[in-house]
From Swiss-Prot:
It comes from Schizosaccharomyces pombe (strain 972 / ATCC 24843). GO terms for cellular component: cytoplasmic side of endoplasmic reticulum membrane; UDP-N-acetylglucosamine transferase complex. Involved in protein N-glycosylation. Essential for the second step of the dolichol-linked oligosaccharide pathway. Belongs to the glycosyltransferase 28 family. Keywords: Endoplasmic reticulum, Glycosyltransferase, Transferase. This is UDP-N-acetylglucosamine transferase subunit alg13. It catalyses: an N-acetyl-alpha-D-glucosaminyl-diphospho-di-trans,poly-cis-dolichol + UDP-N-acetyl-alpha-D-glucosamine = an N,N'-diacetylchitobiosyl-diphospho-di-trans,poly-cis-dolichol + UDP + H(+). Heterodimer with alg14 to form a functional enzyme.
Length: 162
C-alpha cells in the first residue's frame, strides 16, 4: 500500500519536511503503508535525499502532467489544501488528510479544509500535528463525497469566499 503526498504547484517545504520525519514514517508503516510517494513541487531542496525507516520506501518527483494515477494508486492522500487537489482526491473516494499551507498570503486553505472536515469528507491538521492527523484519519469513517454532483463543493467554495 502506498501514501501519496502532493503540494501542488506551490512551495510547501514544511509539509515535505513533516512527511519525511521518522515518527511520521513509523506511523505510516504501522498502518500498513510501505511506500511514500511525494510530489514536492518547488521543494526539491526540502525533499533532498530522504532517509526512510525500515519497511518504507520513499520516492519523489517535482511535477507530473497529471496526478490522477498517483491518487488512484494510493491508499491515502496527504495534500495541501488547494481546491483542485482536494476535489480530485474526494472524487476518487480516497482517504484524505489535508494540511493547509498557512504561510500563503490571503489564504483560504484553512477555511476550505475546516469546512470540508466539518462535513466529514476529510481530516485536516497542521504540519506540526501530522502524526495525530494520520491517527485520526485511520479509524474514522468518512462521508463519501458525491461523485457527479459538484454543488456540494461549489457551496463550500461560496461559503469560504464570503
Amino acid at each position: 500500500m502506498n501514501a501519496f503526498v502532493t503540494v501542488g504547484s506551490t512551495q510547501f517545504d514544511d509539509l515535505i519536511r513533516a512527511v519525511l520525519k521518522p515518527e511520521f514514517q513509523h506511523c505510516l508503516v504501522k498502518h500498513g503503508i510501505n511506500q511514500l510517494i511525494v510530489q514536492y513541487g518547488k521543494g526539491k531542496q526540502a525533499f533532498g535525499d530522504p532517509k526512510s525507516v525500515a519497511g518504507l520506501t520513499i520516492l519523489g518527483f517535482d511535477y507530473a502532467p497529471e496526478i490522477e494515477s498517483y491518487i488512484h494508486d494510493a491508499s491515502i492522500v496527504i495534500s495541501h489544501a488547494g481546491a483542485g487537489s482536494i476535489l480530485q482526491t474526494l472524487r476518487s473516494g480516497k482517504r484524505l488528510l489535508v494540511v493547509p499551507n498557512e504561510s500563503l498570503m490571503d489564504n483560504h486553505q484553512v477555511e476550505l479544509a475546516t469546512k470540508l472536515a466539518s462535513m466529514n469528507y476529510l481530516v485536516t491538521c497542521s504540519t506540526s500535528n501530522l502524526v495525530e492527523g494520520l491517527e485520526e484519519l485511520y479509524p474514522k469513517i468518512l462521508t463519501p463525497f458525491p461523485k457527479s454532483d459538484c454543488s456540494t463543493f461549489q457551496k463550500v467554495m461560496q461559503d469560504v469566499a464570503r
